[in-house]
């Protein structure tokens, strides 16, 4: 049974909260929060353990003074992966940790998204959360443990937050005993391999009323979910498909564990007893400014918001904001330290009024700022084969969002090598997402990817990965690049669609096409009743104005990836399930549009490498490689093919054309899958060695024969072998004899014979 216990050591000042997670048939996991021993000078420091082996130190620290000139909350989250956590020395040149891995950056985002909304609005002091991975069981995932540790450190720091955040990873594990699947919290890597779907859920406790009774409930704040890599095959074998209902079930299954983790953190904070600190708050505007702006703009602004084109609408609303600012500034300027401060508040109030108008119109009239209905998708445009020499390319447009997808294929040895604490050391399918500033008509820095780009790329990668063919079916490394050329709502889901198109154009035999859609949710009180309106294919403005946004990607039959963030204290199950079904309808519409252009793999580009496989006995691997790589290097040089050998004896041959590949296959088979040559067969061989009694001639890699000196003179006596043939010389020979030890005797023959 899941439970929370507390321990205090007054002598050493240690306080512990231990949460036991009961997974039924799959045993229990223990999450232990400990404070008082490490990092005592941080405002809050908690060491978090998953069972006994995985250990993370989370610290939260705030600056003494607010940052001047900031109109946002300066929160920074950093995750430090220490290689000593896994008993390893970093593989970099300097043998120390460098910039964070992709996994660490994704963990930072996973922590930031649910924790940021818990801080009081108007806080401008710099807050830094640092999570250091100190010990790591290779069977565990640390990212969700880090959410809980970061929340606990923040909760005891005295900073103004609304409460603790609990995070849990749930895996739907399917095995012989559980053919319909069981949800397992904090799954191991082995259980991950058995699962068909995983979901990370973060939430907090809120007070609710039912009649006269008050009770605590879990409000979901963030969801990250994805299907497993082998989900298609598992579903064919009878496992449940990860449908919209499975997602809803996973959310409900996660709530009891989030409740336990939040209670453990709250109990720890009560026992630590740190007093709440006072921080100056900087609200974006005063009630007086808001009221003045609202009286001025409501009617005209509502009219301007009905302009359908984004640029026209933005230009009109911005021009009107400047007009209102000029009109109200003389009235409020004297109340502020500078005209700039007054101007900033008027603009903030204007944006808040605009948000309120849009939300009200959505709830009462199902109005959208571009004129669509709540379930309508913007105009779609699909094209493939845009980039001349790319192996595969596509252009996917949805309204003003425009994504270019480009696919590159290469040898398996080009897969990404991963030097991080995450399970697995290589990645064959890589998805890279670029978001240049011109995509929104702005200027800015270009170069190395920012955290947002890495996060969007990871989401698109997770969406497509379940339909990527296996290494055996398609022995290529695959790099997919998404270029966001225009942005007005969900470039990440546009990237999923562009990827399917581009991969098909490159000839990749996907198990099924995948599409994605971004959804929004707006809620509010209308005539005393809470109304919810789900929006399909949200614009950038609707994303900012809504209470929840979620992105859903999948095939026609099941979900492959989902990401959800909400500001609400809870979403009724019926509302969420209806929104997921609405997203499915949109996904099917997009898939049909894509299928009209390309509905299966094209023929591979002439510029793509041709990769074939040959299986050789494991015992022959060394012979194929040869001493110091002699044989493999000779094969590469002679045929022009690239050759990669796996530990199981699978040989991958990559060549620019079919003839080179066939030549390499023939030579590999001759060496490692040899058919014994027969007496009378002729070869054009190469003299590899001369001795006093004859010349050794290479017939095939690793297969030599001897031409005796007596056979070299065409019937005449030869004093020295080197007088007739020299090393490196080509010579036409015929097999005269093969003795019982397999030694080959050769005789030279004239080419015309």
Curated annotation (Swiss-Prot):
The keyword Transit peptide does not apply. Coiled coil: none annotated. Its EC number is 2.7.7.8. Keywords: Cytoplasm, Magnesium, Metal-binding, Nucleotidyltransferase, RNA-binding, Transferase. GO terms for cellular component: cytosol. It holds the Pfam family KH_1. GO terms for biological process: mRNA catabolic process; RNA processing. It is an enzyme of class 2 (transferase). Its main location: cytoplasm. Mg(2+) binds at residues 543, 549. GO terms for molecular function: 3'-5'-RNA exonuclease activity; magnesium ion binding; polyribonucleotide nucleotidyltransferase activity; RNA binding. It is found in: Cytoplasm. It catalyses: RNA(n+1) + phosphate = RNA(n) + a ribonucleoside 5'-diphosphate. InterPro entries: ExoRNase_PH_dom1 (IPR001247), ExoRNase_PH_dom2_sf (IPR036345), GPSI/PNP (IPR014069), KH_dom (IPR004087), KH_dom_type_1 (IPR004088), KH_dom_type_1_sf (IPR036612), NA-bd_OB-fold (IPR012340), PNPase (IPR012162). The keyword Disulfide bond does not apply. Residues 609-668 form the KH domain. Its cofactor is Mg(2+). SUPFAM superfamilies: Eukaryotic type KH-domain (KH-domain type I), Nucleic acid-binding proteins, Polynucleotide phosphorylase/guanosine pentaphosphate synthase (PNPase/GPSI), domain 3, Ribonuclease PH domain 2-like, Ribosomal protein S5 domain 2-like. Involved in mRNA degradation. Catalyzes the phosphorolysis of single-stranded polyribonucleotides processively in the 3'- to 5'-direction. Belongs to the polyribonucleotide nucleotidyltransferase family. This is Polyribonucleotide nucleotidyltransferase. It comes from Corynebacterium glutamicum (strain R).
């Amino acid at each position: 049974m899941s439970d929370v216990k507390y321990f205090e050591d007054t002598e050493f000042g240690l306080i512990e909260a231990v949460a036991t997670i009961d997974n039924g048939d799959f045993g229990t996991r223990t999450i232990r929060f400990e404070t008082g021993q490490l990092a005592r000078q941080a405002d809050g420091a908690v060491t978090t353990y998953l069972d006994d082996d995985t250990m993370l130190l989370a610290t939260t620290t705030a600056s003494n003074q607010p940052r001047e000139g900031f109109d946002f909350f300066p929160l920074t989250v950093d995750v430090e992966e220490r290689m000593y956590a896994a008993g390893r020395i970093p593989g970099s040149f300097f043998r120390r940790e460098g910039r964070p891995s992709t996994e660490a950056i994704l963990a930072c985002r996973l922590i930031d998204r649910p924790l940021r909304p818990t801080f009081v609005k108007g806080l401008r002091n710099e807050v830094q959360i640092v999570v250091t991975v100190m010990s790591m069981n290779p069977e565990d995932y640390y990212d969700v443990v880090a959410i809980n540790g970061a929340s606990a450190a923040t909760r005891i720091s005295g900073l103004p937050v609304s409460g603790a955040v609990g995070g849990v990873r749930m895996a739907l594990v399917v095995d012989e005993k559980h053919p319909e699947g069981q949800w397992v919290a904090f799954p191991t890597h082995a259980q991950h391999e058995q699962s068909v779907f995983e979901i990370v859920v973060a939430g907090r406790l809120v007070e609710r009323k039912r009649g006269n009774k008050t009770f605590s409930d879990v409000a979901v704040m963030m969801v990250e979910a994805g299907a497993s890599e082998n989900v298609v095959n598992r579903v064919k074998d009878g496992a449940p498909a990860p449908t919209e209902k499975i997602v809803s079930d996973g959310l409900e299954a996660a709530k009891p564990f989030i409740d336990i983790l939040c209670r453990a953190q709250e109990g720890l904070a009560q026992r630590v007893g740190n007093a709440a600190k006072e921080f100056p708050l900087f609200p974006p505007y005063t009630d007086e400014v808001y009221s003045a702006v609202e009286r001025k703009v409501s009617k005209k602004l509502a009219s301007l918001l009905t302009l359908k084109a984004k640029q026209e609408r933005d230009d009109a609303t911005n021009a009107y904001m400047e007009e209102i600012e000029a009109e109200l500034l003389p009235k409020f300027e004297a109340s502020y330290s500078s005209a700039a401060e007054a101007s900033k508040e008027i603009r903030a109030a204007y944006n808040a009024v605009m948000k309120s108008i849009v939300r009200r119109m959505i709830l009462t009239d199902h109005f959208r700022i571009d004129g669509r209905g709540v379930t309508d998708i913007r105009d779609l445009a699909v094209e493939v084969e845009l980039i001349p020499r790319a192996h595969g390319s596509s252009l996917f447009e949805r309204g003003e969002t425009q994504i270019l997808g480009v696919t590159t294929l290469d040898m398996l040895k080009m897969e990404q090598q991963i030097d991080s604490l995450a399970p697995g050391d290589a990645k064959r399918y890589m998805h890279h997402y670029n978001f240049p500033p011109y995509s929104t008509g702005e200027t800015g820095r270009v170069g190395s990817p920012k955290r947002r780009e890495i996060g969007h790329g990871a989401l698109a990668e997770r969406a497509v990965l379940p339909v990527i063919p296996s290494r055996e079916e398609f022995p290529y490394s695959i790099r997919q690049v998404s270029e966001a050329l225009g942005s007005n709502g969900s470039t990440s889901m546009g990237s999923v669609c562009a990827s399917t198109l581009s991969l098909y154009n490159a000839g990749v035999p996907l198990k099924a096409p995948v599409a994605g859609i971004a959804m929004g949710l707006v809620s509010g009180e209308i005539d005393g009743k809470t109304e919810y309106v789900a929006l399909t294919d949200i614009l950038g403005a609707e994303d900012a104005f809504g209470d929840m946004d979620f992105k859903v990607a999948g095939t026609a039959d099941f979900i492959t990836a989902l990401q959800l963030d909400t500001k609400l204290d809870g979403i009724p199950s019926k509302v969420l399930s209806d929104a997921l079904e609405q997203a499915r309808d949109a996904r099917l519409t997009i898939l049909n549009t894509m299928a009209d252009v390309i509905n299966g793999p094209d023929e591979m580009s002439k510029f793509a490498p041709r990769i074939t496989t040959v299986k050789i006995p494991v015992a022959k691997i060394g012979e194929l490689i040869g001493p110091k790589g002699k044989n493999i290097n000779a094969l590469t040089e002679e045929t022009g093919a690239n050759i990669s050998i796996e530990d199981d004896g699978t040989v991958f041959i990559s060549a620019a054309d079919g003839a080179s590949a066939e030549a390499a296959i023939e030579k590999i088979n001759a060496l490692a899958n040899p058919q014994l040559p027969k007496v009378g067969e002729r070869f054009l061989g190469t003299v590899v060695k001369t001795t006093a009694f004859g010349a050794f001639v290479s017939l095939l890699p690793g297969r030599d024969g001897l031409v005796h000196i007596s056979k070299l003179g065409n019937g005449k006596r030869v004093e020295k072998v080197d007088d007739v043939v020299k090393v490196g010389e080509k010579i036409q020979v015929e097999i005269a004899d093969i003795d019982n030890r397999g030694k080959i005797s050769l005789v030279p023959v004239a080419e015309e014979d």
